[in-house]
């Protein structure tokens, strides 16, 4: 390897090293020594990334930071719903009805599953689209529920059941309530070293919006799956798209 190529490889490795040093995720084989030596011939960039991916300490620190930020942000979101919107008056009765419980389970499921996938994507060397299977499964369940509701709802009532009385409010409040959870997740993911920042940020947006939607559902009185699969789904996807646009910069090395 000539001197120019060696210097270029060293600089690439050093930039990655500084990124990981900043988040206290130094790999166990001690590459500070490699940096001090100034010898870029000893390791290729691909080897460096594989070693980073094998280090479990980065994942552990990301999970801890995620919980530290997510728990208070969700608590604040819950307080906003409780004080600002109010919990629906018939909540005790609603909790006994499957259509109400299912929407909370679906939204919370999106949030929790997406959080797990986002943490995996925040580590280099992880497959991207292949890890989205669980989210696709939740989407299939939601669409099946929507088809069931369409079949069982009288034709004359389908339009009203879909539009409801509060879909504009829903489309505004879910993004507003999602802001803090999404910010907490993105902050935790910055400890990682994702090679797919847009996809990782999109999944992070799904996670934060899903959790916020589960909280918002405690206030929303629209119980038809035609309503909440449509409008909750659009609001969650909208937040995810905005997060992907922002995360392409926030999560890039």
Where are the language model's segments positioned?
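N-terminal juxtamembrane cytosolic/stromal segments of multi-pass membrane proteins
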Residues: 34-67
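Non-cytosolic membrane-interface motifs at loop->transmembrane helix junctions
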Residues: 94-100, 158-171, 200, 225-234
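Hydrophobic alpha-helical transmembrane segments in multi-pass integral membrane proteins
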Residues: 145-153, 211-222
């Amino acid at each position: 390897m000539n001197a120019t190529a060696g210097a270029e490889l060293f600089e690439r490795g050093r930039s990655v090293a500084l990124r990981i040093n900043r988040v206290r995720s130094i790999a166990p084989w001690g590459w500070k020594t490699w940096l001090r030596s100034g010898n870029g011939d000893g390791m290729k960039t691909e080897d460096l990334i594989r070693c980073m991916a094998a280090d479990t300490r980065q994942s552990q620190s990301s999970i801890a930071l995620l919980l530290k930020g997510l728990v208070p942000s969700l608590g604040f979101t819950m307080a906003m719903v409780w004080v600002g919107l109010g919990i629906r008056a018939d909540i005790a009765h609603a909790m006994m009805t499957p259509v109400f419980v299912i929407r909370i389970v679906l939204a919370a499921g999106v949030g929790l599953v997406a959080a797990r996938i986002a943490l995996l994507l925040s580590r280099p060397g992880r497959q991207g689209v292949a890890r989205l299977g669980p989210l696709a499964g939740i989407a299939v369940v939601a669409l099946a529920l929507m088809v069931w509701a369409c079949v069982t709802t009288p034709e004359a009532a389908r339009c009203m059941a879909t539009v409801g009385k509060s879909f504009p409010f829903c489309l505004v409040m879910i993004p507003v309530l999602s802001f803090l959870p999404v910010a907490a997740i993105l902050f935790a993911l910055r400890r990682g070293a994702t090679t797919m920042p847009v996809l990782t940020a999109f999944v992070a947006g799904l996670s934060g919006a899903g959790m916020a939607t589960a909280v918002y559902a405690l206030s929303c009185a629209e119980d038809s799956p035609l309503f909440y699969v449509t409008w909750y789904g659009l609001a969650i996807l909208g937040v995810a798209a905005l997060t992907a646009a922002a995360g392409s910069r926030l999560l890039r090395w």
